[in-house]
Amino acid sequence: MAMKPSLHFCPTTVTKKFVYSFQSSFCFRFLRYSSSISLGSCKGVTFSSRNDQIASRRFSFSRDCNNGVWLENWNRIQKRNQPKPPKVVVNYRKEGRFSGSEIVSGDDNRSRDGDGSTMEKIVEKLKKYGYMEEVQNKEIEQERRIEKGSVEDIFYVEEGKLPNTRGGFTEESLLGGENVIGSNGDVGFPWEKMSAKEKKELEAEWTAKKENRYSLAEMTLPESELRRLRNLTFRTASKMRIRGGGVTQVAVDAIKEKWKSAEIVRLKIEGASALNMRKMHEILEKKTGGLVIWRSGTSISLYRGVSYELPSGKWNKQRREETPPEAVIENHDETTTMVDKSDEKVHLPQLEQETTSVEKKDQTSPVVEYEDELDELLDDLGPRFMDWPGDNPLPVDADLLPGAIPDYEPPFRVLPYGVRSSLGPKEATALRRLARSIPPHFALGRSRQLQGLATAMVRLWEKSMLAKIAIKRGVQSTTSERMAEDLKKLTGGIMLSRNKDFLVFYRGKNFLSREVADALVEQERFVRTLQDEEEQARLRGSSALIVPSTEPANKLVSAGTLGETLDATGKWGKNLDDDDHSDEVKQEVEILRHENLVRKLERKLAFAERKLLKAERGLAKVEVCLKPAEQREDPESITDEERFMFRKLGLKMKAFLLLGRRGVFDGTVENMHLHWKYRELVKIIVKAKTFDGVKKVALALEAESGGILVSIDKVTKGYAIIVYRGQDYKRPTMLRPKNLLTKRKALARSIELQRREGLLKHISTMQAKAKQLRAEIEQMEKVTDKGDEELYNKLDMAYASSDEETDEEDDDDAFPETYAEGEDGEEGEILAGELSETEDKDLDSNESETGFGDDSVLFAEDLHTKSEDLPNKKVRLQHQS
């Protein structure tokens, strides 16, 4: 449809700004997918304005006369906006005339630059008629690519592509996505529907959605029959419960008994078996021979099968398992009418290995051979555990093996030269990973008499380096630990892992097979026999009486022979058969032991003395910080009736003060005065161990606060102290008294008190040790001439080593820390440094009051004198000998 040239359009101010903004930056183009409109030629309507400058810039629209061209070009494949490499030279020139070049129709022959030049048109025409090669075209196209990120690239519009939210044009944002553009590149209308073929192609592509799994019942039974059986399942109300023991032989017999009257059995799985329903699915199909037609949560519907009543049920089951999946699918297509006959192939998702037993036939041959060989080996080891809830092969029932074997001995082991006996971390990890995948070899329930199991494990280790033992239900963890220790002693293996379900043992690097072990034992027995014979010959030779001759020997004796040994013994050797000589040696040993014990006791006593002195110093440092207030001379008194009422009211009070480890400090007294502002009583809860300590705290509170102590009662939270403020109570100007410690210093004082309590306990311990040392010294004096073996052994056990002494000496330096003033501006300091000379004098004067100083000094002097007498006794004994 042609437009009349006499029609004019005068843009408004907004239109002017819009045109000016696009005029200097890029070439504006109106595109409709594959059709284009150039803004260069003046064929149709001319736009003009009143302004002379704008009148010179005319926009002319050219439209093809054929109205069906745009509809024919709708499905034409458009060129996608591929990533553009940077352009070598970019034309950013600004022209006064805003025109666009015409786009030549074709697949790849399009002009991308808004400024159409004559040379470019000539090149495009030459390429169209075949006068130019493809290489030249690629070189020109490479030169004319727009730089990525430039102004032209941002506002560049290509046919068939829509901008994304960020202003760019990507392959993913083509006309709203792949629902408009097909896989072959055709552009479709939004209202058009996809064909069935396109849907299948899209479904065949990979998606993140989990694929459906087909069970054995879905592949073997027709859909109508499967629907009927499921409806029958929903109408069946009774359920059979499978407990934590799993699918035992009793459960299998019960299921088969129910199949005689009904073709469907509903099961409810309980206990640990319900944690893995997929595995329970496989176990039920394998042990019963049925088919699981429905499963939801822990509920399973088990179908007995089409050929259940036939006598050759096992053969049919085996035949069904050996049927390949392709044949099953073909039979299913023939029986069902819902499948389209035109489709030759049915695309099913890939069946996983753990869904059906059909996949087990596709496993590699080495795994099957291992299972068969293991099954034969387990048959030789003992009877099977028929109630095993897991897969085949069934483990050996270790409870049926003999408990005690007469003359049982652990297997003989020899570690090869240069091999480390223990396992490295990587080796142990690899063996544990291997043990996870193998089935258990034994099932054990008892905890004693495991010699039969140990023998079977040794036989198993000849073929396999691991022995995996499953623990039956009901065995406690402590019992399994005892089982593991007993088996480790009986077999000599290495325990890799132990949990509530399995025990895994490694045979060890020093394990030997039965034949090799027997040969080595025989060889060792032969060597021992030869050694015994040689030793007997030496004893016979040494028992002969040899009299040393004074005449020089003319014969030379060869070195290293028995004759040389006898010669040397006769000349310089000591005869141990002499009783006097043995008594002398024993007496010397006793004297040395006596010296060592006295020296050890002396060190102990000296250390105890130092400990007592340091304990007294610590007590003195703590007492320096204590400056309690004195009791009032004329305290205000209350009557018994008032005391009874105040006690009753105070115990009913909900508000209370909690006195912690800091004890009585300025903050405690301040809180008491704050309580007395609104009430006459204050209740203080103290968590103390003894009543005497609570009484001291109560008296201190009464003295510091100026109140009247009403009562001290035992409550559930500790002890309750109730203090009455008095009739003539006046609030003091300073709520925090200056004579008490601050919160920080009170904490330091509590630490010192705790240390003092420990030191007092240590003092009492040292006092008891001192008494014990005195008694031991007195007893040692009685046995000086003749040693008492029982006494020496007792003292050696009491003072075995000097490690304890070194540890205690290291603890001597643990003095109270220094508590200095912080940044809160508190006054005073608590320092734990050295005592002054006056304090040392006070301690020396107070030493007699403690009752330890004089006794310890006298005791040390006695020990010193006794230790000096020991060398003299030793000399006398040597002269006597």
Curated annotation (Swiss-Prot):
Targeting signal (transit peptide) range: 1-50
> According to its UniProt record, where is this protein located?
Plastid, Chloroplast; Mitochondrion
Q: What is this protein called?
A: CRM-domain containing factor CFM3A, chloroplastic/mitochondrial
Domain CRM, first and last residues per copy: 219-315, 421-518, 636-736
Q: Which UniProt keywords apply?
A: Chloroplast, Coiled coil, Mitochondrion, mRNA processing, mRNA splicing, Plastid, Repeat, Ribonucleoprotein, RNA-binding, Transit peptide
Q: Which residues form a coiled coil?
A: 588-617, 752-786
GO MF entries: mRNA binding
Question: What does the subunit comment say?
Answer: Interacts with RNA. Part of large ribonucleo-protein particles that contain CAF1 and/or CAF2, and RNC1.
Give the main location.
plastid
- GO CC terms in record: chloroplast; mitochondrion; ribonucleoprotein complex
Query: Which residue ranges are recorded for the region named Disordered?
Result: 799-856
Kindly indicate whether the keyword Chloroplast belongs to this entry. yes
One biological process term from GO is: seed development
Asked whether the keyword Iron is assigned, the reply is no
User: What happens in the null mutant?
Assistant: Albino seeds that fail to germinate or yield very slow-growing seedlings and stunted plants. The seeds of the double mutant plants cfm3a-4 and cfm3b-2 fail to germinate.
Q: What residue spans carry the Acidic residues bias annotation? A: 802-829, 836-847
- Note the PANTHER family from the entry: CRM-DOMAIN CONTAINING FACTOR CFM3A, CHLOROPLASTIC_MITOCHONDRIAL (PTHR31846:SF19), CRS1 / YHBY (CRM) DOMAIN-CONTAINING PROTEIN (PTHR31846)
Stated role: Binds specific group II introns in chloroplasts and facilitates their splicing. Acts on subgroup IIB introns. The substrates of the subgroup IIB also require the CRM domain proteins CAF1 or CAF2, with a simultaneous binding of CFM3A and CAF1 or CAF2. Required for seed development. May influence the biogenesis of the mitochondrial small ribosomal subunit.
| Organism the protein comes from | Arabidopsis thaliana (Mouse-ear cress)
